[in-house]
Amino acid sequence: MKITKELWGTSPDGKEIFLYTLENESGAFVRLSSIGAGIVSIAVPDKDGKIADVVLGYTKPEDYFADGPCAGKCPGRYANRIALGKFTLDGVEYSLPVNNGPNHLHGGPEGFQNQVWESRAERKAVEFQYFSQDGEAGYPGNLKVVAHYEWSEDNALRLTFTAQTDKATVLNLTNHAYFNLDGEGNGNILDHELRFNAAVYLPTDETLIPVGEADPVAGTPMDFQEFKKIGAEIKADFPALNYGKGYDNCFMINDYEPGQLQTAAQLYSPESGRQLEVLTTQPAVQIYTGNWLEGCPAGKCGRGYHDYEGVAIECQHCPDSPNKPEFPTTVLRPGETFSEAIIWAFSVRK
C-alpha cells in the first residue's frame, strides 16, 4: 500500500488542507481530504480492467466548503434531520440551527462537514480527528471524533468512527459520498441496479421527518429487496417520492444487531460491470438519488453535475432519533465510546 500526502490548500480561516492518496498494488486508489474527513475519489476497475473514479467531487478544495450536496464528507454532529432544530435530553431542551426548511440538517451550516479535521497517515490507513466544543451548533458536550480509513488490496474502503464526550449528547455519523459506477461525470445513475437488505422504510412528512413506525416496502416503489433499476419507479406518484423529487428515504436494515457488520446495500452498473457492496454496523441506510445536484460547484469532470448523476447510500442512525424514542438511541454519555463502521467493497461482474 502506497500512501502519499500533499498540501491541497488553505481554509478561509487559515488552516492547512491535506489530500491523501492510498494506492494498492493493482493501481486502484482512494483520495481523502481533511475537509470534513471527506472521500474525494475512489478509482476502481470496470469489467475490462479500466480504472475510473466512481465518486462525485470537486477539483478545488474551496468548493467543498458549504456545498449543498455535502459531497463525500462526514456530516455531524447529527447527520440527517432533527425536526424543528430541537430535542430534549435529560430534561433539558436544546436548540440547533435551522437550515433545511423548518429543520436542522447535517449539524447545521457549521457542521463537521465544513470543518478542517486534524489528520495523519499510518502504515495502511489515514486517520482524521475533530474536536467539537460544548455548545457548538447548540449541542451539549465536548466531543472528540475520529474517522479512520483503511483501503485494502481487494478494493474495499473501511471507515470506522469512534467518539467520546464529557456530557450527554446526541450523535449520528455517516459519509455522504455520491457514487456513479460508470465513472464520475459519465451520465446519470437511473439505470444502476440497487438492492437493499431492508423490508421496511420510514415514511415522512413533506419536510422529510419520519412520522412514526416503519412501513413495509413490499408492493411499493420503495421495494429494493431484489435488484431494481433506480429509475424504474422514481417518478411514481407516491408520497415518499413526491416530497423529494426522487428517493431521499431511510430504510431499516434487516435483523440489526448493534456492533455487527452486515450488508446494507448493493449497487450494480450493467454498463461498466462495477458492483459496490455496502456493509455497516449501523441500523439504517438513507438513499439519496442526487435530486438537487444542479447548481453545485464544477465537478472533477470539468462541468457542473446534473440531477441524478450520483447516488448517496448513507449508513447511519435514523433521522430525528433524538425526538423518536422508538428508534435506536443516538445518545452518547460520558464513559461510553461511540463506535460504528462502514465498508464499501468494490468488485466486477463479467
Tell me what each language-model feature is:
Residues M1-K350:
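An exposed, glycine/acidic-rich loop-and-rim segment of catalytic or binding clefts
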